[in-house]
A protein has these predicted regions:
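N-terminal, intrinsically disordered, polar/charged segments of Gram-positive cell-envelope systems
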Residues: 27-72, 94
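Solvent-exposed loop/turn segments at secondary-structure junctions
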Residues: 76-80, 106-110, 149-151, 158-159
Length: 192
């Protein structure tokens, strides 16, 4: 009788452990953060109430071919990108821009994915030529699209002298010029 009770308890405990593994294996422990919060973590000078929405290469292709919007192409580990975003954000805020599509290009560019090559083809007249003679999507790049047509393209700091640093490049004159240029681009279409 004692042995039977012990076996029953073992069986119940075993069933409970199996149930725990199944339950905990399906449970999503990740906390949900918004794109704006994620962007703010990657670009620490930007607050969490920002218009940046993460998109993949499929979405970028769809915007470039059919839609209206602003696409920011880059990656957060780039110091030039960090400064570019820091200077871009106030202009977006002033103009009440509610959505900027952010395409983190690093993985697709490294792997030269099919979609990335299609994006390069669509942007070919805006791309710079490398020393090897190939077109290359340098970042940061800001693309203004209206009804599937690129109307403006800005990659002001994508090719800067190797001895120049972002904090020395962005002086008062450069900031004013950049803000004026982006304000002009934003006035040419309704991006909201």
């Amino acid at each position: 009788m004692k042995k039977m009770t012990r076996n029953f308890i073992y069986l119940v405990l075993f069933a409970f452990l199996i149930w725990c593994f199944v339950y905990l294996g399906k449970k999503d422990f990740s906390s949900t953060i918004t794109d704006a919060e994620r962007f703010s973590k990657e670009y620490t000078t930007i607050d969490t109430d920002n218009p940046f929405v993460y998109v993949n290469s499929n979405r970028v292709l769809n915007i470039l071919n059919n839609e209206t919007g602003i696409i920011l192409v880059g990656f957060s580990s780039n110091a030039w990108m960090q400064e570019y975003v820091r200077e871009l954000y106030p202009v977006l805020k002033e103009n009440n821009i509610t959505k900027v599509y952010y395409y983190d290009v690093i993985e697709d560019r490294t792997k030269k994915t099919k979609n990335f090559r299609q994006i390069e083809d669509l942007l070919s007249k805006y791309l710079k030529i490398t020393d090897m003679g190939a077109e290359y999507l340098f970042t940061p790049a800001l693309i203004f699209v209206k009804d599937g047509k690129i109307i403006n393209y800005d990659d002001e700091t994508s090719l800067v002298s190797f001895d120049m640093r972002p904090d020395t490049y962005w002086n008062e004159v450069a900031i004013t010029s950049f803000h004026n240029k982006i304000n002009t681009y934003l006035s040419e279409a309704d991006y909201n």
